[in-house]
Amino acid sequence: MGDVVLVVNRFVLGAGPVDERDVTGPDPDAERDFLDRAERALAALAGCAGFVHGELGRAADDPTRWCLATRWASIGAYRRALGSYQVKVAATPLLAEAVDEPTGYEVLRSAGADGITAEDSDRAPGEANRPPRR
């Protein structure tokens, strides 16, 4: 797979804490709005060079939790995509609502019909265990 990068953006619909005993889900209108915006964001990202695959999913056990997962040919391709006009218009406003956490992951192991494939990290030696600079 080479330099494939996995980007995971997680979202929580609705405001305030959810009572775990009564998870009824987000407001249907808010959910439709989120789905429409997420579909436009995914389409904009899919139109960029280096885009490999993308999916939007909802948590099976909590209808307020969503995930937009995309795969890119490289971290550079993903970062260039974020700079495109169409992505700035259609995706950036949605991505700004994502849970504030790291989103880009280098793929080091993958599984397929042929078994497990191992990839080396692109991080410099000694950097693999060092926290990111802030």
Q: Model regions: which residues?
A:
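Non-catalytic surface loops within mature trypsin-like serine protease
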Residues: 13-15, 74, 106-109
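An amphipathic, aromatic/His-enriched active-site/gating alpha helix that lines ligand/cofactor pockets
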Residues: 46-52, 71-105
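Low-complexity, intrinsically disordered short peptide segments enriched in small/polar/basic residues
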Residues: 2-5, 15, 20, 104
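Short, well-ordered beta-strand segments in beta-rich or mixed alpha/beta enzyme
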Residues: 5-11, 21-22, 55-83
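Generic alpha-helix initiation/capping and coil-helix boundary signal
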Residues: 2, 31-34, 74
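Glycine-rich beta-strand-turn "strand-cap" elements at beta-sheet edges
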Residues: 1-3, 55-64, 90-134
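Short amphipathic alpha-helical segments
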Residues: 17-53, 86-90, 94
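Intrinsically disordered, low-complexity terminal tails and inter-domain linkers enriched
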Residues: 15-32, 113, 117-128
